[in-house]
UniProtKB/Swiss-Prot annotation:
Keywords attached to this entry: ATP-binding, Cytoplasm, Fatty acid biosynthesis, Fatty acid metabolism, Lipid biosynthesis, Lipid metabolism, Nucleotide-binding, Transferase
Domain CoA carboxyltransferase C-terminal, residue spans: 39-293
Designated name of the protein: Acetyl-coenzyme A carboxylase carboxyl transferase subunit alpha
GO molecular function: acetyl-CoA carboxylase activity; ATP binding; carboxyl- or carbamoyltransferase activity
Gene name, Swiss-Prot/TrEMBL: accA
SUPFAM superfamilies, alphabetized: ClpP/crotonase
Organism: Agrobacterium fabrum (strain C58 / ATCC 33970) (Agrobacterium tumefaciens (strain C58))
InterPro entries (alphabetical): Acetyl_CoA_COase_a_su (IPR001095), ClpP/crotonase-like_dom_sf (IPR029045), COA_CT_C (IPR011763)
Family: Belongs to the AccA family.
Length: 317
């Protein structure tokens, strides 16, 4: 069953009528509803084109958070082979919010790291809704160290509202773990390609997104804080999240114009959740092209370019 967002009500109404007509035809084969169904499907396409061509920042945030949007595990299954996940930080415990390990991409050995939100109640609790604790970032550091040691390109997939802000996480050094992970991303002498596939929230995102190439899916968002959090801080009113989202410049178009990201991966009309295979394939093509380009550079050059890239962002914004 499709989960509709608030602004998708016209689409919901039309698709509801299509379902009713198909059910009616199934119950009585003498009734021909094909012409009406075709007409309604055409109206659905027109409605989606109209709605998705003018999404505002808050609506894009809702699309980025859609529960049926493809997650890290979907990309891992479709784009990579021989994925061998690594677990634990060798200091405290395992954190399933971050998935990381070794795999092959188009036959090439790589390291992959990403946040996983889960797709049902059980898996969301297991993965802590994609909000990593220090152990997750220290696991990412382990994989980055392995990649550097064995000269493996790194692919990171970002999808988190932010790092977990719990007391235990803070007591175990959340800030230090995020800083160390960011530092490791900046220091390794291998290519890093990062893609924001959903939400890119705060330091929890940047900790694994400090890549030589950074891309965003068309309807993903990337920001220092959630719109609700920004509204609560600025105006003491979380209901002004829509206003905050607009002012924060969190969309892929905003960030491309600001020079924060290198490119935008188009999504089908209706969002990635409507055609996940199409989006995953397009993402794979972008990653492949970026890795092919970056493979021509030396390790020293890769590290220097990556550092300069993020220094320039800090100086120019």
């Amino acid at each position: 069953m499709h989960n509709y967002l608030d602004f998708e009500k016209p689409i919901s109404d039309l698709e509801g009528k299509i379902i009713e007509l198909k059910k009616l035809a199934d119950e009585d084969e003498s009734i021909d509803t094909s012409e009406e169904i075709n007409r309604l499907e055409s109206r659905v396409n027109d409605a989606m084109q109209d709605i998705y061509s003018k999404l505002n920042a808050w609506q894009k945030t809702q699309v980025a958070r859609h529960p049926q949007r493809p997650h890290f595990v979907d990309y891992a299954k479709s784009l990579f082979t021989d994925f061998t996940p690594l677990a634990g930080d060798r200091k405290f415990s395992e954190d399933a919010a971050i998935q990381a390990g070794l795999a092959r991409f188009n036959g090439q050995p790589v390291a992959i790291i990403g946040q996983e939100k889960g797709n049902d109640t059980k898996s969301r609790l297991k993965h802590n809704f994609g909000s990593a604790r220090p152990e997750g970032y220290r696991k990412a550091i382990r994989v980055l160290e392995l990649a550097d040691r064995f000269s493996l390109p790194v692919v990171t997939l970002i999808d988190t509202a932010g790092a977990y802000p719990g007391v235990g996480a803070e007591e175990r050094g959340q800030a230090e773990a995020i800083a160390r992970s960011t530092e490791m991303c900046l220091n390794v002498k291998v290519p890093i390609v990062s893609v924001v596939i959903g939400e890119g929230g705060s330091g929890g995102a940047i900790a694994i997104a400090t890549g030589n190439r950074v891309y965003m899916l068309e309807h993903s968002v990337y920001s220092v804080i959630s719109p609700e959090g920004a509204a609560s801080i600025l105006w003491r009113d979380s209901t002004r999240a829509k206003e905050a989202a607009t002012n924060m410049k969190i969309t892929s178009e905003d960030l491309k114009s600001l020079g924060v990201i290198d490119g935008i991966i188009p999504e089908p009309i209706g969002g990635a959740h409507r055609a996940p295979e199409t989006v995953i394939s397009a993402t794979g093509d972008v990653i492949a092209k970026a890795l092919a380009d970056l493979s021509q550079r030396s390790g020293t050059q890769l590290r220097a370019e990556r550092r300069q890239k993020f220094l320039d962002i800090g100086r120019n914004l």
